[in-house]
């Protein structure tokens, strides 16, 4: 299966991207069958705004994101389009990916392994409980994603606080049904020039993160949670009340974390109380986030 159209939004690149795309389409004999739209940015818009521009320029009912220089496996589109034909309620579908180096040599791992995705998380998404999973963390990578264009009615405009793929997943999980395919359907390159890369964190990485300065990251997370709450509120009846109430709880939890005192000893009673209420487990990474709040330097 081939795409009906390709939208290229070139964010002020210097590697001849547009010419390469046009040359490839012509060489493969697809110039008469695939509609090509080329957008050029100068100055650059940045990752999220550039994707928003490209997505808005599409015309087809299903949109497959393709960023950086990742490689789709043969049959990837057909595999991902099929569930949309079978399920009218499906808004977004994503998959695993094989991690490769810049020469496409497999690195012996997958995206889900690097992200430490739990089987229980995948089962919950497949069972229709994706919003509960995304209250804790995002599992969707844009390069593995296909979604209905109709999702844009609720998702646009993308807020500045969010990355495009995380936002699309959050809105899809809040307003309808999303799903996940556990098989890797693309090769996801890892190299120095990646805009966004991934690797499984080591124990040392986690310790460094736990004791790192708090900085403004919790304020940023609060801003993200508030932006999503604002959008869900605006969407009204399209969002189940249970999701809205859950997001209110997420905002309260993120505000709690953002307002913790600089003195680590002073945090202990309130952090333990928040943990006993189950909010770290529901809205964050459980004991890992508890340890972070107890150990982070103010």
Regions found by a protein language model. Give the residues of each.
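Nucleotide-sugar donor-binding/catalytic module of glycosyltransferases
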Residues: 1-201
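C-terminal subregions of glycosyltransferases and related glycan-biosynthesis enzymes
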Residues: 134, 160-162, 166-167, 178, ...
